[in-house]
Amino acid sequence: MGVAFDKCDTRPAHIDAILNGLDRYNPETTTVFQDYVAQQCEDRTFDCYANLALLKLYQFNPHLLQAETATNILAKALTVFPSPAFSLCLALLPAHTQPFPTADADASQTSDFVESVQKLARLSTLLESAQYAQFWSTLNSDDLYADLVADVAGFEELVRIRIAVEVGKAFREINAEVLEQWFDLRSREALEKFVTEVCGWEVDKAGPNGTVVKVPSNKENEVRSEVKSEHVGVEMFGRVIRRGFEQAA
């Protein structure tokens, strides 16, 4: 059974009290939530429900918006893909931060924040569409990307682990060269250490097609034959035929 969306095992008691009370909509709690986002970045935790509450406060009180905190929330959401977290957070950003602002949008608002949101949205699209090599290529293509994820401790490692989880669902065996690109681990030694120590997979160097990585079977990647059959009794045909005669009469 999945964990409820509004639950987080690592959530502090004072944050839980705010989320379950009227103070959730109190602008004075904005700083408390912002400090909690910073804590999540340091502790490698993610509390989507609390982060959405902060973004909702920003939506109600645009003047309180902290661009760095908002982008940190989006960057943290990337580390829990595939999930709706990033899309939900993106949808709650104030109108002037959207890539396509309305005609009456405040022109004084900095465009740097909009650019940052667009870049993070691009990374999210690449991850959600399983374009892992392109994700790393894009991440490494611009120093701004590095700045956007700099506050998130272990960002690259967290993303690699999520990629590994998705790979483990789809493959039983995969070429090491492909994984080097998907994990952005250009050293074979680094790749072998990651897949064996972190993922618990096996490296086979004696394969006919070069080094391959073998993934243990699980309920997602195991091939199963499934036979479906339905029993249709004679009495069912009898009812259909009888109904046809009744309508004709």
Curated annotation (Swiss-Prot):
PROSITE patterns: PCI (PS50250)
The name this protein goes by in its record: Eukaryotic translation initiation factor 3 subunit K
Organism: Aspergillus clavatus (strain ATCC 1007 / CBS 513.65 / DSM 816 / NCTC 3887 / NRRL 1 / QM 1276 / 107)
Stored SUPFAM superfamilies: ARM repeat, Winged helix' DNA-binding domain
GO terms for biological process, alphabetical: formation of cytoplasmic translation initiation complex; regulation of translational initiation
Domain of life (superkingdom): Eukaryota
Pfam families named among the record's database cross-references: CSN8_PSD8_EIF3K
Record note on quaternary structure: Component of the eukaryotic translation initiation factor 3 (eIF-3) complex.
GO molecular function, one term: translation initiation factor activity
Similarity comment text for this entry: Belongs to the eIF-3 subunit K family.
Keyword Protein biosynthesis attached: yes
Residues in PCI domain copies: 46-222
